[in-house]
Amino acid sequence: MLTQVADGVWVRQSEWVWTNSIAVRGEDGLILIDPGIDGSELNQLADDVDRLGIPVVAGFSTHPHWDHLLWHPRFGDVPRYATPAAAHVANEARERAQAMAAESASGIPLELIGLVAPLPADGGPVPG
């Protein structure tokens, strides 16, 4: 379940491992940070986001480990970002991340893993 930790900030801790999914409200909607970590938890996170009633406008991966590159179709076809270095690694090692996810967790939409673009070099604008 998403827990509000500050105005416009919600956190959901994985039941499987100690990792957090974060939702931050911007002017236009939510930015999802590191959504995860298996198919069941991605569905639960999508349910939580639906209950908020705020559209997802972007995603962000904090680093290029497979469990931080996940996405779910229910979050929408929105831009997904990482730092330039993380986006480069994610794109170069996408097949490996998909294989690791398939070995480690179930129900993950493997085709959506690692589809991140580098943040704009000038720092903006980013949806949200």
Predicted features by range, described:
Residues 27-29, 78, 85:
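Short loop segments at secondary-structure junctions
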Residues 17, 67, 86-88:
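Surface-exposed, flexible loop/turn segments at secondary-structure boundaries
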Residues 2-47, 51:
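Conserved beta-strand hairpin/beta-sheet module of binuclear metal-dependent hydrolase folds
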Residues 4, 88-128:
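Metallo-beta-lactamase
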Residues 40-82:
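Active-site metal-binding motif and surrounding structural segment of the metallo-beta-lactamase
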Residues 13-15, 84, 127:
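Residues at the C-termini of beta-strands that transition into short coil/loop
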Residues 6, 51, 75-77, 120, ...:
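Short, well-ordered coil/turn elements that cap or connect secondary structure elements
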Residues 37-38, 84-88:
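Short, acidic/turn-prone active-site loops that include or flank metal/cofactor-
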